[in-house]
């Protein structure tokens, strides 16, 4: 069976970058993504599950069989909801119109990435424009044995760490 898909957008918005292709092509062991994603999401989220699946299919296609994923609907069973929450995937509230009434429902839109005994998660997939970067960053972090170090000098009028929260948060995530 031949898999092919054409991305006719000028920016190649629906294609993996060469860096992401090389990253999964060089996986030397099984890498699993568990995508906890509610099946029937209301607008504006209703296409996100399909678009995420397409992106994960691309990763798998370039991985020589080492990249696998599971697309799981946690709302189907309470034990699956609990599993998602154990992995750090919280439920989010979404607005749904049913019977001409606006209601709030619980939904899941998160990923857990597993490699060996290590794991990372993306708690809520909010912006699919950045999902390739987020997934590839997590893959690189999980598969890399190199731990970079950073040093900050102070005392020369630089802002204190408390004042540069964004940098601190970014470093914590790394």
List PLM regions with ranges:
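Short, surface-exposed patches at the edges or C-terminal ends of soluble domains, predominantly
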Residues: 1-174
């Amino acid at each position: 069976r031949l898999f092919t898909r054409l991305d006719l957008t000028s920016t190649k918005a629906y294609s993996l970058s060469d860096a992401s292709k090389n990253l999964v092509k060089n996986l030397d062991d099984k890498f699993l993504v568990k995508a906890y994603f509610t099946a029937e999401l209301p607008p504006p989220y209703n296409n996100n599950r399909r678009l995420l699946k397409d992106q994960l299919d691309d990763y798998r296609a370039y991985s020589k069989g080492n990249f696998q994923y599971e697309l799981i609907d946690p709302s189907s069973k309470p034990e699956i909801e609990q599993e998602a929450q154990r992995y750090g995937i919280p439920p989010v509230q979404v607005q749904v119109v049913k019977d001409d009434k606006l209601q709030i429902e619980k939904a899941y839109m998160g990923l857990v990435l597993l490699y060996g005994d290590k794991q990372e998660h993306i708690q809520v997939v909010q912006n699919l424009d950045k999902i390739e970067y987020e997934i590839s960053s997590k893959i690189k972090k999980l598969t890399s044995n190199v731990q970079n170090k950073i040093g900050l000098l102070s005392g020369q009028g630089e802002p204190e760490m408390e004042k540069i929260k964004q940098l601190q948060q970014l470093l914590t995530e790394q």
